[in-house]
Every structure is written in structure tokens, then in C-alpha cells.
Regions:
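Enriched for short, Lys/Arg-rich terminal
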Residues: 1-23, 37-38, 53-57, 62-82
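A short, surface-exposed loop/turn module that caps and links secondary-structure elements
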Residues: 27-53, 81
């Protein structure tokens, strides 16, 4: 299992989500950290950033080490790629 760390902005983003969406995003992050499975893909032109798709939400993250995931921010899909 990988350790998940949140940047301060990502923690604020998560707290601002509606409760139902917040639970879905937390579950998806935890599932990805445990299994490596989820709708995640590398972002072109963004260095080593990846995104995890959770409904209408996009979780951007990087692997800091093979066993550490750093969540950068959580945005609605309309705003995620601007």
C-alpha cells in the first residue's frame, strides 16, 4: 500500500466538495493507493503528473517515491485542465 500525502491546497479542495462527492473521491484515492487500479493516466506536457478520474472530479497527483503519492489538487472536470 502506498502512503498518500495531500498538499495544503488539495486538502482544502477535498473539504470544499459536497459530502457525497468527498466520500467518493476519498474512496477512489484509497483504492488507488492500495491496488494501483483506477482511471488514472499520465498528463501530457505536465512532467510526471497523473490524474485520477472520479465522476466529475479530477485528482492530480505525483509519485514522490515509489511508495508515496502526493495529491496536488482536486478540481471539477470543467476546470481541471485550464
Amino acid at each position: 500500500m502506498k502512503r498518500v500525502l495531500f498538499r495544503p491546497q488539495a486538502a482544502r479542495d477535498l473539504k470544499r466538495l459536497p459530502n457525497r462527492d468527498q466520500d467518493q473521491v476519498e474512496d477512489a484515492i484509497e483504492r488507488f493507493a492500495q491496488t494501483g487500479f483506477g482511471d488514472a493516466k499520465m498528463l501530457a506536457g505536465e512532467g510526471r503528473q497523473l490524474r485520477l478520474r472520479v465522476g466529475d472530479w479530477r485528482v492530480r497527483f505525483v509519485y514522490e517515491k515509489p511508495d508515496i503519492i502526493r495529491i496536488l489538487h482536486i478540481r471539477n472536470r470543467r476546470e481541471a485542465y485550464r
